[in-house]
Amino acid sequence: MNPLWSMSAGSVRKRAEGEEKTLAGDVKTSPPRSAPKKQLPSIPKNALPIAKPTSPAPAAQSTNGTHASYGPFYLEYSLLAEFTLVVKQKLPGVYVQPSYRSALVWFGVIFIRHGLYQDGVFKFTVYIPDNYPDGDCPRLLFDIPVFHPLVDPTSGELDVKRAFAKWRRNHNHIWQVLMYARRVFYKIDTTSPLNPEAAVLYEKDIQLFKSKVVDSVKVCTARLFDQPKIEDPYAISFSPWNPSVHDEAREKMLTQKKPDEQHNKSVHVAGLSWVKPGSVQPFSKEEKTVAT
């Protein structure tokens, strides 16, 4: 080992020990000072105690998960959007009209044009949950119970939950319920029926089933002019044919309007231009001066 390295290392250790002693000797500790006790000012007489601030109350939530202050507007907007979708779908033979008194109640009627229930006219009412679209599926009740496996023979309610076991927001819509109500009259399903008699007859005795269906259609037709079950200005009601009232409306519906497109195509409408007809030079068209 090089002796110079050992000497230098030893001198470094001694220098470090000397510096530590010097630093230790320079440090002086002062005795702790006793801080004066803090005293609160005396409470004046007849002073009321200070109440603790209360935390703000949680914002009220409506049943559909929105803030209670704008919950009704959100519900109204949702139902308006649903009715717009119904109009756009143009379901054949299905007509609906929201109630005047409540947007959660819709009146409707279904016209069946062929099949086992041909010539059937079935009025119904749709009841929408007040927490729509976060609740269960809407309910659909026929004004007169129709003889059908999926219609309750007492209440006239259609088994809507069969098709919508869980109502999914932004995925299921009311127009789908209306389409389902129309489809059940063309495609009969007898599994887990609400009317067991109708299901058994459809499977075992189709002729007797058809006979009961015809009777049910006749009953609904005979009571078509009855007053609506719910008193509402927008409830759907039928009245006998009155030529003085209905002939004019019938002619308007049957008369086809002449298309205006052909007339517009034949008429040439000149637009603004600064090119003289027959010339390709820009700004060749002379401007007409107005006499003053």
UniProtKB/Swiss-Prot annotation:
UniProt xrefs under InterPro entries: Ub_conjugating_enzyme (IPR050113), UBQ-conjugat_E2_core (IPR000608), UBQ-conjugating_enzyme/RWD (IPR016135)
One GO process term, biological-process aspect: lysosome organization
Protein's UniProt keywords contain Transport: yes
Location of the region described as Disordered in the Swiss-Prot/TrEMBL record: 1-63
Expression tissues: Ubiquitous. Highest expression in kidney, testis and brain and lowest in spleen and liver.
A Pfam family it matches: UQ_con
Domain UBC core: 74-222
Protein's membrane topology: Peripheral membrane protein
Locations listed in the record: Cytoplasm; Cell membrane
Keyword NADP among record annotations: no
GO terms for cellular component: FHF complex; HOPS complex; plasma membrane
Disease implication from the record: Defects in Aktip are a cause of embryonic death in homozygous animals. Death occurs at about 10 days of development. Symptoms include loss of left-right asymmetry, malformation of the developing brain and of the spinal cord, syndactyly and polydactyly. Heterozygous animals are characterized by polydactyly and thymic hyperplasia.
Function: Component of the FTS/Hook/FHIP complex (FHF complex). The FHF complex may function to promote vesicle trafficking and/or fusion via the homotypic vesicular protein sorting complex (the HOPS complex). Regulates apoptosis by enhancing phosphorylation and activation of AKT1. Increases release of TNFSF6 via the AKT1/GSK3B/NFATC1 signaling cascade. FHF complex promotes the distribution of AP-4 complex to the perinuclear area of the cell.
PANTHER family: UBIQUITIN-CONJUGATING ENZYME E2
Name assigned to this protein: AKT-interacting protein
Native source organism of the sequence: Mus musculus (Mouse)
Gene designation: Aktip
